[in-house]
Amino acid sequence: MSSSNLGNVVCVTGASGYIASWLVRLLLHRGYTVKATVRDPNDPKKVDHLVKLDGAKERLQLFKANLLEEGAFDSVVQGCHGVFHTASPFYHDVKDPQAELIDPALKGTLNVLNSCAKSPSLKRVVLTSSIAAVAYNGKPRTPDVVVDETWFTDADFCAKSNLWYVVSKTLAEEAAWKFVKENNIDMVTINPAMVIGPLLQPVLNTSAAAILNLINGAQTFPNASFGWVNVKDVANAHILAYENASASGRHCLVERVAHYSEVVRILRELYPSLQLPEKCADDKPYVPIYQVSKEKAKSLGLEYTPLEVSIKETVESLKEKKFANL
């Protein structure tokens, strides 16, 4: 444990989530005192894995906070030097996108930032955004194209295609930048792509489910290319962006862009006996891969875990947590 951060108090919202759980673990390991918010501190599925973390007994405090309840974060944020706002829903099957995704992302972010504006101790906010807020603007993404932090997703363009998660992250990040400019808050954003790697929480999350589907008997793999990144690298990037005084703006996090066919190929090499999908879900040409700039991530001092290792860690974790019966 690093002793240099003792007395350094930070808040993590949505602490029971996939990225946030790792963030809490790494912050505790580095000596921080963590004030963590969850929707229900009495739900063992939300908090048991957090209270068992090394250092939790001494330096982790849990608070109940609802994203949509005005002022719910005021008392938690008071006295904090840093706030990591990770809380935002991520799932695809939505009936009411406004209520299920957009309101919690947008209003929730502004609610947390509003509390930050009232806290004189606050030095910096790190916002968990997404590559979803960067790369979806109708511009072609082909192998010679490099997506970087100057790209902004076009929310209207995405709403027409019912990409509601993408819309929610885009509107939330746009509103956050506007708010922090007006209120003179120092904020940086972390914009990861598809996050995989080991699970600390007992509940299956959306991005790990993408790997689970491939190893649990799917007949086909999706015709899609995504950026992939390890959850531990994402959590680490949040802390580096907080600690590194010169960090600013947005930080895309992608170790590699790979088509699902490539992910299946890696799985086949790692686990030759697995029943894996042989064919693509459609007969169209494969959606091309593209590049994502690593410059901003490098400026934080971040080193990436290779995709092969991340995939293996994900499968081993899914086995250990009994999601996959291999």
Swiss-Prot record:
- Is Isomerase among this UniProt entry's keywords? no
Q: Which GO terms describe its cellular component?
A: cytoplasm
Q: Where in the cell is it found?
A: Cytoplasm
| Organism, scientific name | Medicago truncatula (Barrel medic)
> What role is this protein assigned?
Involved in lignin biosynthesis. Regulates the monolignol composition by catalyzing the conversion of cinnamoyl-CoAs into their corresponding cinnamaldehydes. Can use coumaraldehyde and coniferaldehyde as substrates, but barely sinapaldehyde.
Gene3D superfamilies recorded: NAD(P)-binding Rossmann-like Domain
Residue positions binding (E)-coniferaldehyde:
130, 136, 141, 165, 194, 207, 226, 257, 290
Query: What does the UniProt record report as the effect of altering residue 136 to F in this chain?
Result: Increase activity with sinapaldehyde as substrate. Strongly increase activity with sinapaldehyde as substrate
Name this protein carries in UniProt? Cinnamoyl-CoA reductase CAD2
Q: Which UniProt keywords apply?
A: Cytoplasm, NADP, Oxidoreductase
